[in-house]
Amino acid sequence: MPDIINIIKGCLAGSRRDQELLYRRHAAKLYAVCLQYSGNDDEARDILQEGFIKIFENLIHYKNEGSFEGWMRRIVVNTALEKYRSKHNLYRVDDIDAIPEPDASPETDDYSGLEAGDLLMIIRDLPHKYRMVFNLYAIEGYSHKEISQMINISEGTSKSNLSRARIILQKKVSLYTGVNKKVISG
């Protein structure tokens, strides 16, 4: 099985076989990322397709520093963010900072009764604006400042959306598991 560097070289040389191999190796994982940011399967497939087009167009810029999968993931996340921005005609709202936030520091707890797939399904049911901030903060590891710049909201709005997402998740997880637990700290 060819290593990733040889596959990248083949893709850069225009090899359809290597492009297909790259796609087949990584499409499932990247599709899961797309599902985190999309409203439905069709939108996730669109993001995946657009993301792979950008991956192939930008392979020349990959510097073989760090994880190639991480590099592709960033492209797919950015593609999802672009789609979100264009779909929602986002503009900055700063006065949301005046709204008091709910408790933003829930504790992490054990979710032994909850499968990862079930948790992802619960996250996917969040309202889109909350899901977007939750994914970027809790899953991708971006700061509120970075999130605010990515999706054109204030840092306060990012914090508020994360807090509200956590409250919703906490309620849904407790309903799902029958136990009152707090959701993912940060």
Go through each PLM region and give its residues.
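Internal acidic/polar
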Residues: 1, 82, 90-116, 143
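A short, charge-rich alpha-helical start-of-domain segment used by transcription regulators
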Residues: 8-32
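C-terminal edge and immediately downstream basic/flexible tail or linker adjoining helix-turn-helix-like DNA-binding
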Residues: 10, 91, 149-152, 166-186
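Sigma70-family region 2
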Residues: 12-13, 49-67, 87-88
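Amphipathic, Lys/Arg- and hydrophobic-enriched alpha-helical face
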Residues: 23-41, 58, 123, 175
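Structural recognition of an alpha-helix C-terminal capping motif at a helix-to-coil junction
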Residues: 32, 46-53, 66-78
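Arg/Lys-rich amphipathic alpha helix in sigma70-family domain 2
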Residues: 60-64, 74-94, 164
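Helix-turn-helix DNA-binding module
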Residues: 121-124, 128-132, 140-157
